[in-house]
């Protein structure tokens, strides 16, 4: 869902300088539980795509356990790991480059986007995933991580 801004009641503090979301932007936001319920509803039957999945899924795992009493349970694709595998594998095209999202976008000739903006990061990640899929012979099962059920 585009434009969903959680509001847990806490001030954003210095993190506003990174993600650009200010306290006044969150006035009409939803609670964490409602935001996570919407996320869960949108993920059913789908694969999540992240650029550094361990970081994102750890955050989601903690938030979901706290707010919903369940953990992260969806398959995911990590474009960072996939891009790095292409760097260290037999693919000379990516050899030794930085692997952060902007570097991956630049490597594949994609235009720059605003970093640390949730929607722009999601679109950037999806575009990199589409390019990696087009350039790879890997099957979904080879690049998709299945969740560990705890």
Protein language model features and the residues they cover:
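Conserved non-catalytic scaffold segment of RNase H-like nuclease domains
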Residues: 1-67, 71-73, 95-112, 116
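Short, glycine/acidic-enriched loop or turn micro-motifs at the edges of active sites
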Residues: 55, 81, 124
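Short, well-ordered secondary-structure micro-motifs
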Residues: 60-62, 86-89
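Short, structured loop/turn "capping" segments at alpha-beta junctions
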Residues: 70-75, 138-142
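Conserved beta-strand -> loop -> alpha-helix junction used to position metal-binding or nucleic-acid-contacting
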Residues: 71-85
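Acidic two-metal-ion nuclease catalytic site recognized across multiple nuclease folds
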Residues: 88, 107, 126-150
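Conserved catalytic/binding loops enriched for acidic/polar residues
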Residues: 121
């Amino acid at each position: 869902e585009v434009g969903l801004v959680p509001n847990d009641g806490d001030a954003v503090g210095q993190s506003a300088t990174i993600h650009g979301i200010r306290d006044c932007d969150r006035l009409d936001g939803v609670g964490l539980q409602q935001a996570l319920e919407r996320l869960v509803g949108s993920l059913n039957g789908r694969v999540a795509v992240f650029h550094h999945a361990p970081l994102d899924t750890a955050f989601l795992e903690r938030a979901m356990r706290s707010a919903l009493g369940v953990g992260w349970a969806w398959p995911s694709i990590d474009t960072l790991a996939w891009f790095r595998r292409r760097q260290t594998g037999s693919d000379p095209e990516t050899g030794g480059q930085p692997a952060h999202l902007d570097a991956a976008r630049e490597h594949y000739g994609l235009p720059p986007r605003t970093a640390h903006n949730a929607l722009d990061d999601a679109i950037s990640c999806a575009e990199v995933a589409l390019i990696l899929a087009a350039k790879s012979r890997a099957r979904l099962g080879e690049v998709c991580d299945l969740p560990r059920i705890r």
